[in-house]
A protein has these predicted regions:
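Catalytic toxin/effector domains delivered as secreted proteins or via bacterial secretion systems
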Residues: 1-146
Length: 146
């Protein structure tokens, strides 16, 4: 890129390089695809199906239980204390509270299960649950992906 500097009237050459994001995008797409398969594994329904309660959605409803599938990729948010998480700075804890609130506001007592693919993510949430930092009303289940 060329541009005239008003200070010295000289032409400056600035090079601009576009970063190669294909590897990042490919890796993210692979995780998203695996998570869709994981959701289907956990819910036994097509990935595009959701079960809505108020303004929140669950991945499925099975045997009288609202089901959410927490696939791969959450460990990085735990390691950074949920900053920059798609779930907000409160992370999955805030997300869980929103889901519980929606069920309670609907006047329901339907149980909620979270199936968690990553063992480290499961362990973190389980420990938070034991210490009262994660809602005890949500049953946490470690379900490894097929």
């Amino acid at each position: 890129m060329k541009h005239n500097s008003p200070l010295n009237n000289k032409v400056n050459n600035h090079s601009h390089t576009t970063p190669n994001t294909h590897r990042v995008n490919d890796a993210m797409e692979a995780i998203l695809t695996r998570n869709l398969y994981y959701k289907e594994q956990v819910t036994n329904t097509p990935a595009e199906y959701y079960y809505h309660v108020g303004d929140v959605s669950f991945d499925g409803y099975r045997d009288g239980v609202l089901v959410d599938a927490r696939g791969e990729g959450l460990l990085k948010y735990i390691e950074t204390n949920w900053t920059a998480s798609v779930y907000g700075n409160g992370g999955l804890v805030d997300w869980a509270l929103r889901k519980l609130e929606a069920v309670h506001n609907a006047g329901a007592t339907t149980p909620i299960q979270w199936h968690i693919a990553e063992k480290d993510t499961f362990d973190d949430l389980f420990n938070r649950q034991k210490s009262g930092e994660f809602p005890a009303e949500i049953e946490l289940i470690h379900t490894p992906p097929n």
